[in-house]
Amino acid sequence: MRYNSPVLVIHGGAGSWRNMERDRALKALRESLERGYGEFRAGSSLEAVVEAIASMEDSGIFNAGRGSVKNSEGGVEMDAGLMYGKTLSVGSVGSIRARNPIRRAYEVLKQGRHVLMVRTVWEDIEMGDNSRDGNTVGAVALDEQGNLSAGTSTGGIRGKLPGRVGDSPVPGAGFYATTRVAVSCTGIGELILRLLPAKEIDMLRAMGYPLDESVRAVMGKFTETFGRDNLGLIALDYQGYASASFNTGAMPRGIKWNGGEKVFFDEVDQL
């Protein structure tokens, strides 16, 4: 469906969500949309993505920021990545501990010297309840100047080995943004890193395929290759078309545009 810019799309992670309260997740999504969308007044799509994700990191509801799951040694290591489509600027962090990993990724992007920094930040933070089935968070945005941005943040896989880095801070895998499209993914990082669904959607869009068709094709290929219960994604293109898909039990998500707002939980292929 096509929306009037500026547009902000977010997700709270694809997964089973068996132990999660639906109402709390949707409330956190609405707060994220409000906080992120406010950035359009003075900032670009990049700032909208950062603030929307930071809001979800702060909530403690999702597997990101305060809600991050623990690794096999009982510690917390977080990953996040951010990309600005107009300049292909990227900032990513891996295996860090911070209240807002997406802000750390934003710092890397603004500095412009490197793309991915690992194990550079260890903040003391008050963690939330990470016993739920919350998952990776992400956002994509289109501002009134036509610029696209994408970002993703996660605490990784519960019980992972220390030092494990998933797809979330890797451009083309957990997130990607160009002048054509912005994508944020969620799911099993070890699989996403092998197929690079975010990059594949951009390639199909560059070949002239509509966004919905591109998303369905990539989701179909991923599911055919690796089975189900492993991927969800949101996508937004330069024309304001938005799309979402997942092959898991649910993927809380929402969209806010110049004219309205919607949130979803387990409704398949709706945005």
Task: Tell me what each language-model feature is.
Residues 1-271:
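Alpha/propeptide regions of enzymes that mature by internal proteolysis
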